[in-house]
């Protein structure tokens, strides 16, 4: 991100790994990794999705109240597992699929962020919803 230096010239600032409360750029964790694995057998499909977001630094000073509530300048990393299963059954004129998905299967809480609205989480990086279960029924003809 360019910034104006004291001498009036612009310089580049590395904002990776930071919350970036003082610029137009949003949080930029150093690492974001997604891994996918599927297994299919006899009309069953099992899937595992792993999502990882690296921790990062919040440069804004924390007040006494924030410190007393346990906030710190390091936003923790976030690792989430999603699991899904589907069964496909062939019918005379089409097929029917039954499915279940568990998003955030281990019910991980989004890391707390001192600077967030209501002292909660970083809305641009983390999903706060916890475990979700999705049932699916689909008929194809």
What are these regions (language model features)?
Residues 50-63, 87-141:
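C-terminal beta-signal and adjacent terminal beta-strands/loops
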Residues 1-90, 115:
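C-terminal beta-barrel architecture of Gram-negative outer-membrane proteins
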């Amino acid at each position: 991100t360019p910034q104006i230096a004291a001498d009036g010239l612009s310089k580049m600032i590395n904002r990776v790994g930071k919350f970036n409360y003082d610029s137009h750029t949003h949080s930029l964790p150093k690492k974001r990794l997604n891994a996918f694995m599927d297994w299919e057998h006899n009309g069953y499909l099992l899937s595992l999705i792993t999502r990882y977001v690296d921790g990062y630094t919040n440069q804004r000073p924390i007040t006494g109240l924030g410190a007393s509530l346990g906030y710190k300048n390091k936003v923790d990393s976030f690792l989430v597992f999603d699991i899904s299963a589907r069964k496909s059954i062939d019918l005379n004129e089409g097929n029917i699929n039954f499915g279940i998905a568990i998003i955030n299967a281990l019910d991980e809480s989004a890391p707390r962020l001192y600077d967030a609205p209501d002292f909660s989480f970083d809305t641009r990086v983390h999903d706060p919803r916890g475990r979700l279960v999705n049932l699916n029924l689909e008929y194809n003809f």
